Amino acid sequence: MEYANENLLSLTREFELRGCKMTRINLVCPSELTDKHLMAEYRELPRIFTYVNKHGVPNDIPERYTLGKGHVKFFCDKLDWLYSRYRSIFCELINRGFAIDKRAYSSVRDSAWVMLGYESRYRPTPEELYLNMARLCKRCKVDNVKKELSSND
C-alpha cells in the first residue's frame, strides 16, 4: 500500500511545487462536462486524497458546498463520494476514447480504499448543482464548447 500512497503523492507534487491551489471538483454528471473540464477534474481530484493522507480530515469543514476558499476542505470528509466520482470520471474518459494511464488510476483507487472509512452519504442539493453549473458556464469559452460539441456529432 505504501507504493500506492507514493504514487498518489507524486501525482500532485508538481502542483504543490508550483504553489497551485486550485482544485476543480464538480458536482454535475461527468457526461455533461467538456473534455477539458473532465480531464482537469480527473487530474485534480486526487489532491484531496493526498491532502487527507498527509494532514487528516480538518476540523473546520464548511457545512455547505462552496467555491473558492473552503472548496477543497468541504470534500475532505466526503471521500466515499469523491471516490465514486473519480470512478465515474475515469469511465467517462474511457467512453470518450481518451488514453488513460490505468496505473495512475489504480494507484488513486488503492490509496482511496485505505481512507474510505469516511462515509458521508453526501448528495449535492439542487442549489449546489446550480452553483457549480453557473461556475462552469462562466469559465467556458462558448466557441470552444461549440467546436467540441460539433466534433462529437
Which ranges hold each PLM region?
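Short hydrophobic alpha-helical segments enriched in small aliphatic residues
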Residues: 4-6
